[in-house]
């Protein structure tokens, strides 16, 4: 789960992290009122969407030379003008795709006199089971280019959660940022505060870009992104309350109601699989055969008729889907139960696109018999490779 920048900053402030003053706004009038409450005379107007690259983004409805989603205003009047241009319009960034995201809220912050920009993030390193702090002296809008062109400018400090954050970790962060004296102490303190928040809130990712050094010698968190482990949200009702469903794909929201893991992609072949690893392998082999998956959909280990029907409905809501590949390995789930669910779901949704089904595992023959006797044009497959070839052929035949 993701939250907006202003929400992330409110959470971090509870852990003592220094952030510039700022107020969220849903209307032009609220943006103007927010600016009037800030010291000024400089203000920053920020579009609030769940995507990075806002500063370099472009609004679909505005001229090509118009400014992006993060703008410096030198007066209250400019704040008003920027708010009018941004609210309700579609911001396209490197992370949104061509469709972009509509800007429904803004964050108006006090201007900061910046001397230097740094980068700091924390992620769960799944390979080691530890928290990795990633830092760079090259913070700002071009951090992706830095990571690609000059990876030596990025340093990683790994923390064993059993040990926790120790003073030497803080010093390592400061040294990696080439800081000394009071600034090094500030960096160490901020890193510790961020780590405490990261662990306490069950974050999966926390990114500060940029962490800025001001002209008067202070370190401030200027922009932040936070993502949370969805499996731990039951422990954080305060975080769940921050969820903005308008920023999420409606199909993904619907899928979550049935405990389905669904992610929309840009292809034309819908996938329904049990198990994340098998789902990724299925998507890979579809691409290997020349087409592209329309989604990632893991029905999990306890799929029933209701879940399978919901999965079909969610897949078919995507108009780009021209065929569906079902790939099920029956371990805990029995293939005959899944087959019954597939047949019932296909009848209920009046399936009109090609459907290829590959079953393997417990009660596989019973499952295949149910599909064969269903009276539906379901194409059986013997293995994963056969399934991929058949669904690609079926989709191309009706194209």
UniProtKB/Swiss-Prot annotation:
**What EC number(s) is this enzyme filed under?**
6.2.1.5
What keywords is this UniProt entry annotated with?
ATP-binding, Ligase, Magnesium, Metal-binding, Nucleotide-binding, Tricarboxylic acid cycle
Q: What class of enzyme is it?
A: ligase
Q: Which residues belong to any copy of the ATP-grasp domain?
A: 9-254
Report any Pfam family annotated for this entry.
Answer: Ligase_CoA
Catalyzed chemical reaction(s): succinate + ATP + CoA = succinyl-CoA + ADP + phosphate; GTP + succinate + CoA = succinyl-CoA + GDP + phosphate
* UniProt GO MF annotations: ATP binding; magnesium ion binding; succinate-CoA ligase (ADP-forming) activity; succinate-CoA ligase (GDP-forming) activity
Q: Which PANTHER family match?
A: SUCCINATE--COA LIGASE [GDP-FORMING] SUBUNIT BETA, MITOCHONDRIAL (PTHR11815:SF10), SUCCINYL-COA SYNTHETASE BETA CHAIN (PTHR11815)
Instruction: Summarize the protein's role.
Output: Succinyl-CoA synthetase functions in the citric acid cycle (TCA), coupling the hydrolysis of succinyl-CoA to the synthesis of either ATP or GTP and thus represents the only step of substrate-level phosphorylation in the TCA. The beta subunit provides nucleotide specificity of the enzyme and binds the substrate succinate, while the binding sites for coenzyme A and phosphate are found in the alpha subunit.
Instruction: State the similarity comment.
Output: Belongs to the succinate/malate CoA ligase beta subunit family.
| Protein name as annotated | Succinate--CoA ligase [ADP-forming] subunit beta
**Species annotation:** Novosphingobium aromaticivorans (strain ATCC 700278 / DSM 12444 / CCUG 56034 / CIP 105152 / NBRC 16084 / F199)
Gene that produces this protein:
sucC
